[in-house]
């Protein structure tokens, strides 16, 4: 009797296929049109998106993508494929028939394409793992919507598990804590992707997860309260976002005598534009120009053995 297969979707939001304005526009269009991401009334938002953002923003951010692009594609795509291969290799050594696929909510390889593949393989179950340790309606819920949409016209839907969050998981906390290694007189900044503050007021508990994540990692790394703090990066548009802002914090830290800095981004399961360019290049310049003496970015977990073990643990519990 053949072994039943389990299909695993490792899901990120997405990335351009090329560092060109048309490719960036192709990615941004569905991303920014999703009401989970930008929830303004469509009759107000669509004219802004199509008349002001999509015609101009791709050209503005194109050089940023070009700074960090790799021979394998965007950093996010390359890291996602690396995670897929490492996790597949892990399960190939086990007794379970697991198919692992990296997939994206707003780009290729799409969730719908992977779901179609799994249905053709007649998997006994699907496990959806959004690679966002902290829940947010802008990420985790958006991925759930995309997964549900991929099943909308299917008749043969197998059972599935959807992993809501894993920020408090000891193996996640320990994996990140082991990467820190603070040096003498070095301060640690936990930088998480921000969301509009209004979303928090309306019930999104993302920032609560972020604060708890930072606290747990700091304790695991043996840090005192004075050695670390939290900020939020990557704000977009005129609305108030979750504070304090990372770019403003980096300018203030040297004035407070914190001139040696390490930055870690626990919300990013893979290095991407927001970590490699925004944090490691642009914000490094801001910090050093403000009087900083040393700046160190601590890479995401990517396809490290500790990260693959964590992901395997999350999946194995649901087989």
Curated annotation (Swiss-Prot):
Provide this UniProt record's keywords sorted from A to Z.
Cytoplasm, Heme biosynthesis, Iron, Lyase, Metal-binding, Porphyrin biosynthesis
The catalytic activity, as recorded, is: Fe-coproporphyrin III + 2 H(+) = coproporphyrin III + Fe(2+)
Pathway of action: Porphyrin-containing compound metabolism; protoheme biosynthesis
Tell me the residue numbers annotated for binding Fe(2+): 193, 274
Q: Answer yes or no on keyword Hydrolase.
A: no
Alphabetized SUPFAM superfamilies for the sequence: Chelatase
- Which top-level enzyme class is recorded in the Swiss-Prot or TrEMBL entry? lyase
Principal location = cytoplasm
Pfam families on file: Ferrochelatase (PF00762)
* Cellular component GO terms, alphabetical: cytoplasm
**NCBIfam families registered for this protein in UniProt:** hemH
| Annotated function | Involved in coproporphyrin-dependent heme b biosynthesis. Catalyzes the insertion of ferrous iron into coproporphyrin III to form Fe-coproporphyrin III.
- Supply the PANTHER family for this chain: FERROCHELATASE (PTHR11108), FERROCHELATASE, MITOCHONDRIAL (PTHR11108:SF1)
What HAMAP family is this protein classified in? Ferrochelatase
* Protein name per UniProt: Coproporphyrin III ferrochelatase
């Amino acid at each position: 009797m053949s072994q039943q297969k389990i299909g695993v979707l490792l899901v990120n939001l997405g990335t351009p296929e090329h560092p060109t304005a048309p490719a960036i526009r192709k990615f941004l269009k569905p991303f920014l049109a999703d009401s989970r991401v930008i929830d303004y009334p469509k009759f107000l938002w669509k004219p802004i998106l199509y008349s002001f953002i999509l015609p101009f923003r791709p050209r503005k951010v194109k050089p940023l993508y070009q700074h960090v692009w790799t021979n394998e594609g965007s950093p996010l795509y390359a890291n996602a494929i690396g995670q897929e291969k490492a996790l597949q290799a892990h399960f190939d050594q086990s007794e379970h028939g697991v198919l692992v696929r990296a997939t994206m909510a707003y780009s290729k390889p799409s969730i719908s394409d992977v779901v179609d593949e799994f249905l053709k393989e007649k998997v006994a179950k699907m496990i959806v793992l959004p690679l966002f340790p902290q829940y947010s309606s802008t990420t985790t819920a958006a991925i759930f919507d995309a997964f549900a949409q991929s099943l909308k016209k299917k008749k043969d839907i197998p059972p599935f598990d959807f992993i809501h969050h894993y920020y408090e998981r000891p193996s996640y906390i320990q994996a990140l804590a082991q990467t820190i290694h603070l040096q003498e007189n070095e301060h640690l900044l936990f930088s998480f992707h921000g969301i509009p503050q209004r979303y928090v007021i309306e019930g999104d508990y993302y920032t609560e997860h972020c604060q708890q994540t930072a606290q747990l990692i700091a304790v695991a790394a043996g840090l005192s309260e004075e050695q670390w703090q939290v900020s939020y990066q990557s704000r977009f548009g005129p609305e108030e976002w979750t504070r304090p802002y990372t770019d403003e914090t980096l300018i203030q830290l040297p004035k407070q005598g914190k001139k040696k800095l390490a930055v870690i981004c626990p919300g990013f399961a893979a290095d991407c534009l927001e970590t490699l360019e925004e944090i490691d290049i642009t914000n490094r310049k801001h910090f050093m120009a403000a009087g900083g003496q040393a700046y160190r970015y601590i890479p995401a977990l990517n396809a490290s053995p500790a990260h693959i073990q964590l992901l395997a643990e999350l999946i194995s519990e649901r087989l």
